[in-house]
Amino acid sequence: VAPAQHLCGSHLVDALYLVCGDRGFFYNPKGIVEQCCHRPCNIFDLQNYCN
């Protein structure tokens, strides 16, 4: 499992594409930026944003 890390901007979007794949994801900038850019998050946090 990847360690928690800060993901911002295009890095965050790229990570969502990798984690969610064909399911896609709903991009809620306020929630995910707060969770993954301002604080470190992990792959399980990212999966919460997949469709």
Curated annotation (Swiss-Prot):
Its BP terms in the Gene Ontology are:
glucose metabolic process
Q: Which UniProt keywords apply?
A: Carbohydrate metabolism, Disulfide bond, Glucose metabolism, Hormone, Secreted
**CDD domains under this entry?**
IlGF_insulin_like
List cystine links: C8-C37, C20-C50, C36-C41
A Pfam family of this chain = Insulin
A cellular component annotation (GO) from this entry: extracellular space
Q: Where in the cell is it found?
A: Secreted
Domain of life according to the entry: Eukaryota
**SMART domains per the record?**
IlGF
State the SUPFAM superfamilies in the record: Insulin-like
Molecular function in Gene Ontology: hormone activity
Does this UniProt record's set of keywords contain Disulfide bond? yes
Q: How does it assemble?
A: Heterodimer of a B chain and an A chain linked by two disulfide bonds.
Instruction: Spell out the family assignment given in the record's similarity comment.
Output: Belongs to the insulin family.
**The protein's role, per its UniProt record:** Insulin decreases blood glucose concentration. It increases cell permeability to monosaccharides, amino acids and fatty acids. It accelerates glycolysis, the pentose phosphate cycle, and glycogen synthesis in liver.
Protein name per UniProt = Insulin
Q: Which organism is it from?
A: Lophius piscatorius (Allmouth goosefish)
From the broadest rank down, the organism's phylogenetic lineage runs: Eukaryota, Metazoa, Chordata, Craniata, Vertebrata
